[in-house]
Amino acid sequence: MRTSLLLCLLPSLLLAASPYPEKTPDTPGNRLIDRYFAEQTREITAENGLAQITTAADWEAKAPEYRRQLFEMLGLDPLPEKTPLNATKTGELKGDGYIVEKMHFQSMPGLYVTANLYLPDKVEKPLPTILYVCGHAVVVKDGVSLGNKAGYEHHGVWYARHGYACMIIDTVQLGEIRGEHHGTYSKGRWWWFSRGYTPAGLEAWSCIRALDYLETRKEVDKTRFGVTGRSGGGAYSWWITALDERIKASAPTAGVTDMQNQVIDGCVEGHCDCMFFLNTYRWNFERMVALAAPRPLLIVNTDKDTIFPIDGVFRIYQNVRKIYTLLGKEGNIGLQVSEGPHKDLQPLNIGAFHWFERFLKGADSMAVLDEGAKKTIQPASLRVFTEIPKDEINTKADETFVPMAKAPAPATNAADWSKQSDTWMQELKAKVFNGWPKDIASVNPQKESSAEVDGIRMTAYDFDSQSPFRLRLYIVHRDGLRAEDLQLVALNVLDEAGWDEFCATYHSRFGKLIEV
């Protein structure tokens, strides 16, 4: 006769694959989860921020690996092939002191980036050039998406009127071809994590390819690239600044805060997937910000922004400023704080304009700007496509941007299998389960109660899993069973549906042991 032991483990953490609620219900379980996230945030802040960097040599030794990790966490390692851009101009319009080229390029075959290139009406020599990346502006007319670039045209106009080239690029989510950023935010696409995909990586790649294109233009001085954008565009400014040292000055606006704000204070609930890399290496976000060093960096924010609160922004600024100080470049980092909410505001714009005047054109720090950014162009006139290309893959980019992993060849002998399985286990621990505790503490098991019904014995134990979780374990077996007689041990880790089924099966007979 086959002798079996059934172990049922009830986690305190029951997660459903559904959109995150606007307000997390206040329950004992959720309070426990909040406590867990607070503990993890404190651990990450202490161990994976910038506190361990004490000398310039420390930073210079570690920064290349940090940059490689960021490429990986954005789904860009290995980097996609740089295929022909197939840049195409579809039209042009003229304004007071500037022209706008309406164009598109393909960051990879079929992945279209729609863009407007703003230039002064007279260009006599290569110009400092701004890559402007867009936030979540929805610009639609008669059911047709004009792209979020049309919501930020006033920035392009200002730069062109003041001696810059400026390219404004659409995002995949809110461009003329509407793709998807909200995979885990609201679409239940949890497989993005397993695939190693985040739309943040796709937008970073669009930025890299935009620079590739701009380098081909005679109007562009490729030694003087700057990047800016607000909200989502602030985040993409961070990605390209950290990844690509062709960016010589940056002014990300309302695009970053620290783990305390995001996790403990709950700001993450208001954010799109495109705002985050897949945090395999458990970074605090200041590490990504510091990859701008020692290049000129202006961190721009408002004092009443509820999704990028100023306290977290200031903590990041203070910690990253230490890196600039170690590198002898403290004058290259600045913090611009203006009054207001999470909104495109003129004082924020002026700060960015002044920063680029100083660091891309050599203007004096007391230089006075003659005007702010003014909206003057009808959005519909900036549209690039009259028809959406039939070969576009923007609408399914999440399925192709990060290639699927290829199944490895099976081992053919015991030695190869041992080596292969050891490698897999190391990779699983380093990547998939990197958040597990490194030191396994005592589980402190405690027998709570036991009962026998109709020859079946159930025993309940409590044990420590990982701080702060103390879990319940139910052991079910034939009464009188000896350990040495066991032939099979089955461990069931129960989700909510499994717990409901377990209760339906056993509660009528073992109700005193089972806490419902």
Language-model-detected regions and their locations in the chain:
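Glycine-rich nucleophile elbow surrounding the catalytic serine of serine-hydrolase chemistry
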Residues: 229-239
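Mobile cap/lid helix-loop segments that gate and shape the active-site cleft of serine hydrolases
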Residues: 193-194, 202, 248-290, 294-295, ...
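Conserved hydrolase catalytic core segment
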Residues: 242-248
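Alpha/beta-hydrolase-fold catalytic nucleophile elbow
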Residues: 170, 228, 253-254, 300, ...
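Bacterial N-terminal signal peptides
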Residues: 4-13
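Alpha/beta-hydrolase fold nucleophile elbow
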Residues: 219-231
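Alpha/beta-hydrolase-fold serine-hydrolase catalytic core, especially in secreted/extracellular enzymes
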Residues: 17-113, 125, 285-287, 293-295, ...
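Cap/lid segment of the alpha/beta-hydrolase catalytic domain
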Residues: 124-222, 256-268, 274, 485-516
